[in-house]
Protein backbone atom coordinates (compact mmCIF):
# COMPACT_ATOMS: atom_id res chain seq x y z
CA UNK A 1 0.00 0.00 0.00
CA UNK A 2 1.56 3.29 -1.14
CA UNK A 3 1.61 6.64 0.61
CA UNK A 4 -1.77 8.42 0.67
CA UNK A 5 -2.10 11.44 -1.62
CA UNK A 6 -5.86 12.02 -1.54
CA UNK A 7 -8.03 14.59 0.30
CA UNK A 8 -6.63 15.08 3.80
CA UNK A 9 -9.78 16.37 5.50
CA UNK A 10 -11.60 13.21 4.43
CA UNK A 11 -9.05 11.25 6.46
CA UNK A 12 -9.32 13.46 9.55
CA UNK A 13 -13.12 13.20 9.46
CA UNK A 14 -12.72 9.44 9.75
CA UNK A 15 -9.73 9.19 12.11
CA UNK A 16 -9.77 12.44 14.09
CA UNK A 17 -7.10 15.12 14.39
CA UNK A 18 -3.80 14.25 12.70
CA UNK A 19 -1.41 17.18 13.31
CA UNK A 20 1.28 15.79 11.03
CA UNK A 21 -1.06 15.43 8.04
CA UNK A 22 -2.88 18.77 8.04
CA UNK A 23 -3.47 21.83 10.20
CA UNK A 24 -6.95 22.33 8.76
CA UNK A 25 -10.04 21.12 10.61
CA UNK A 26 -13.07 19.73 8.83
CA UNK A 27 -16.31 21.66 9.32
CA UNK A 28 -18.19 18.38 8.98
CA UNK A 29 -18.35 16.14 12.03
CA UNK A 30 -19.87 13.08 10.36
CA UNK A 31 -17.66 10.39 8.79
CA UNK A 32 -17.08 10.57 5.00
CA UNK A 33 -19.57 8.92 2.66
CA UNK A 34 -22.92 9.83 1.12
CA UNK A 35 -24.78 9.78 4.43
CA UNK A 36 -21.90 9.21 6.82
CA UNK A 37 -21.28 5.76 8.18
CA UNK A 38 -23.94 4.20 10.35
CA UNK A 39 -22.95 4.19 14.01
CA UNK A 40 -22.55 0.63 15.17
CA UNK A 41 -20.41 -1.19 17.66
CA UNK A 42 -16.97 -1.71 16.18
CA UNK A 43 -15.06 -4.95 16.47
CA UNK A 44 -11.73 -5.10 18.29
CA UNK A 45 -10.08 -5.60 14.92
CA UNK A 46 -11.68 -2.42 13.55
CA UNK A 47 -10.47 -0.43 16.57
CA UNK A 48 -6.89 -1.71 16.15
CA UNK A 49 -7.02 -1.04 12.42
CA UNK A 50 -8.12 2.54 13.04
CA UNK A 51 -5.21 3.17 15.43
CA UNK A 52 -2.81 1.73 12.87
CA UNK A 53 -4.26 3.98 10.18
CA UNK A 54 -3.83 7.03 12.43
CA UNK A 55 -0.13 6.25 12.69
CA UNK A 56 0.23 5.67 8.94
CA UNK A 57 -1.57 8.81 7.85
CA UNK A 58 -0.09 11.12 10.48
CA UNK A 59 3.52 10.19 9.71
CA UNK A 60 2.92 9.65 6.00
CA UNK A 61 4.43 6.18 5.74
CA UNK A 62 3.35 3.28 3.55
CA UNK A 63 2.10 -0.01 4.94
CA UNK A 64 5.37 -1.68 3.96
CA UNK A 65 7.39 0.99 5.77
CA UNK A 66 5.24 0.69 8.90
CA UNK A 67 5.72 -3.09 8.97
CA UNK A 68 9.49 -2.54 8.83
CA UNK A 69 9.28 -0.09 11.74
CA UNK A 70 7.25 -2.59 13.79
CA UNK A 71 9.87 -5.31 13.19
CA UNK A 72 12.66 -2.93 14.15
CA UNK A 73 10.78 -1.79 17.28
CA UNK A 74 10.34 -5.41 18.38
CA UNK A 75 14.06 -6.07 18.01
CA UNK A 76 14.94 -3.20 20.36
CA UNK A 77 14.92 -3.35 24.15
CA UNK A 78 11.96 -1.89 26.02
CA UNK A 79 8.34 -1.31 25.05
CA UNK A 80 7.62 -2.14 21.40
CA UNK A 81 4.96 0.57 21.25
CA UNK A 82 7.26 3.29 22.61
CA UNK A 83 10.09 2.12 20.35
CA UNK A 84 7.76 2.32 17.35
CA UNK A 85 6.73 5.89 18.15
CA UNK A 86 10.36 6.93 18.62
CA UNK A 87 11.34 5.45 15.27
CA UNK A 88 8.62 7.48 13.58
CA UNK A 89 9.44 10.62 15.57
CA UNK A 90 13.10 10.27 14.55
CA UNK A 91 12.35 10.37 10.83
CA UNK A 92 14.03 13.38 9.25
CA UNK A 93 10.78 14.69 7.75
CA UNK A 94 9.09 14.54 11.16
CA UNK A 95 12.03 16.23 12.92
CA UNK A 96 11.83 19.07 10.37
CA UNK A 97 8.10 19.31 11.12
CA UNK A 98 8.68 19.41 14.89
CA UNK A 99 11.28 22.15 14.38
CA UNK A 100 8.71 24.17 12.44
CA UNK A 101 10.56 24.05 9.11
CA UNK A 102 7.43 22.69 7.42
CA UNK A 103 3.79 23.29 8.33
CA UNK A 104 2.99 19.59 8.00
CA UNK A 105 4.96 16.37 7.66
CA UNK A 106 4.20 16.18 3.89
CA UNK A 107 5.45 19.78 3.57
CA UNK A 108 8.59 18.92 5.53
CA UNK A 109 9.11 15.81 3.40
CA UNK A 110 9.04 18.00 0.30
CA UNK A 111 11.74 20.24 1.78
CA UNK A 112 13.92 17.18 2.39
CA UNK A 113 13.23 15.56 -0.99
CA UNK A 114 14.07 18.78 -2.84
CA UNK A 115 17.44 19.15 -1.13
CA UNK A 116 16.71 22.11 1.16
CA UNK A 117 17.80 20.31 4.35
CA UNK A 118 21.27 19.43 5.61
CA UNK A 119 22.27 16.96 8.33
CA UNK A 120 25.66 17.57 9.92
CA UNK A 121 26.55 20.01 7.14
CA UNK A 122 25.67 17.76 4.19
CA UNK A 123 22.52 17.86 2.06
CA UNK A 124 20.38 14.81 2.81
CA UNK A 125 17.30 14.10 0.71
CA UNK A 126 16.16 10.90 2.46
CA UNK A 127 12.96 11.72 4.38
CA UNK A 128 13.09 8.46 6.35
CA UNK A 129 16.63 9.01 7.65
CA UNK A 130 16.75 8.12 11.36
CA UNK A 131 18.00 11.19 13.22
CA UNK A 132 20.17 10.32 16.20
CA UNK A 133 21.54 12.14 19.22
CA UNK A 134 24.12 14.71 18.16
CA UNK A 135 22.74 15.23 14.65
CA UNK A 136 22.46 18.87 13.55
CA UNK A 137 19.60 19.55 11.12
CA UNK A 138 19.71 22.82 9.20
CA UNK A 139 18.15 24.59 6.26
CA UNK A 140 20.59 24.95 3.38
CA UNK A 141 22.47 28.27 3.21
CA UNK A 142 20.55 29.48 0.17
CA UNK A 143 18.08 32.35 -0.04
CA UNK A 144 15.44 30.22 -1.78
CA UNK A 145 15.68 27.47 0.86
CA UNK A 146 15.43 29.91 3.76
CA UNK A 147 12.48 31.72 2.18
CA UNK A 148 10.52 28.46 2.03
CA UNK A 149 10.95 27.94 5.78
CA UNK A 150 10.76 31.43 7.29
CA UNK A 151 6.97 31.71 7.01
CA UNK A 152 6.42 28.25 8.50
CA UNK A 153 8.70 28.72 11.49
CA UNK A 154 6.80 31.84 12.60
CA UNK A 155 3.54 29.86 12.63
CA UNK A 156 4.56 26.22 13.20
CA UNK A 157 2.12 23.33 12.90
CA UNK A 158 2.76 22.47 16.57
CA UNK A 159 3.33 25.17 19.19
CA UNK A 160 6.17 23.59 21.15
CA UNK A 161 9.43 21.98 20.09
CA UNK A 162 10.01 18.77 22.13
CA UNK A 163 12.76 19.06 24.77
CA UNK A 164 14.98 16.46 23.08
CA UNK A 165 15.34 18.83 20.10
CA UNK A 166 17.18 22.14 20.48
CA UNK A 167 16.06 24.86 18.04
CA UNK A 168 18.18 27.83 17.02
CA UNK A 169 15.45 29.81 15.29
CA UNK A 170 17.56 32.66 13.81
CA UNK A 171 19.96 30.14 12.26
CA UNK A 172 17.17 27.74 11.16
CA UNK A 173 19.04 24.91 12.85
CA UNK A 174 18.07 22.13 15.23
CA UNK A 175 20.09 19.63 17.22
CA UNK A 176 18.99 16.23 18.53
CA UNK A 177 19.93 15.91 22.20
CA UNK A 178 18.41 12.56 23.13
CA UNK A 179 15.27 10.44 22.79
CA UNK A 180 11.71 11.67 22.39
CA UNK A 181 9.67 11.07 25.55
CA UNK A 182 6.28 9.43 25.01
CA UNK A 183 4.44 12.45 26.43
CA UNK A 184 5.82 14.66 23.65
CA UNK A 185 4.29 12.60 20.84
CA UNK A 186 1.68 15.03 19.52
CA UNK A 187 -0.65 12.39 18.08
CA UNK A 188 -3.46 10.96 20.22
CA UNK A 189 -2.75 7.28 19.72
CA UNK A 190 -2.88 3.99 21.59
CA UNK A 191 0.31 2.45 20.25
CA UNK A 192 -0.36 -0.83 22.07
CA UNK A 193 -3.36 -1.42 19.81
CA UNK A 194 -1.07 -0.94 16.80
CA UNK A 195 1.36 -3.52 18.20
CA UNK A 196 -1.58 -5.90 18.78
CA UNK A 197 -2.80 -5.32 15.22
CA UNK A 198 0.52 -6.54 13.85
CA UNK A 199 1.05 -9.31 16.40
CA UNK A 200 -0.34 -12.00 14.08
CA UNK A 201 0.59 -10.33 10.82
CA UNK A 202 4.31 -9.66 11.28
Curated annotation (Swiss-Prot):
GO terms for molecular function: rRNA binding; structural constituent of ribosome. Residues 1-13 have a biased composition (Basic residues). The keyword Transmembrane does not apply. Disulfide bonds: none annotated. Residues 1-42 are annotated as: Disordered. Keywords: Ribonucleoprotein, Ribosomal protein, RNA-binding, rRNA-binding. GO terms for cellular component: small ribosomal subunit. The keyword Ribonucleoprotein applies. PROSITE patterns: RIBOSOMAL_S4 (PS00632), S4 (PS50889). One of its GO terms (biological process) is translation. InterPro entries: Ribosomal_uS4, Ribosomal_uS4_bac-type, Ribosomal_uS4_CS, Ribosomal_uS4_N, S4_RNA-bd, S4_RNA-bd_sf. It comes from the Bacteria. Pfam families: Ribosomal_S4, S4. One of the primary rRNA binding proteins, it binds directly to 16S rRNA where it nucleates assembly of the body of the 30S subunit. With S5 and S12 plays an important role in translational accuracy. Part of the 30S ribosomal subunit. Contacts protein S5. The interaction surface between S4 and S5 is involved in control of translational fidelity. Belongs to the universal ribosomal protein uS4 family. This is Small ribosomal subunit protein uS4. It comes from Prochlorococcus marinus (strain MIT 9515).
Amino acid sequence: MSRYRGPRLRVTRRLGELPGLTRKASKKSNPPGQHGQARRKRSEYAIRLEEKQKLRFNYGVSERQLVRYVKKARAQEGSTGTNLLRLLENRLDNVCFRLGFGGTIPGSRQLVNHGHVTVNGKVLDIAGYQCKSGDVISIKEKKASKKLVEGNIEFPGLANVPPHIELDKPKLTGKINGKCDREWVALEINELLVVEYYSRKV
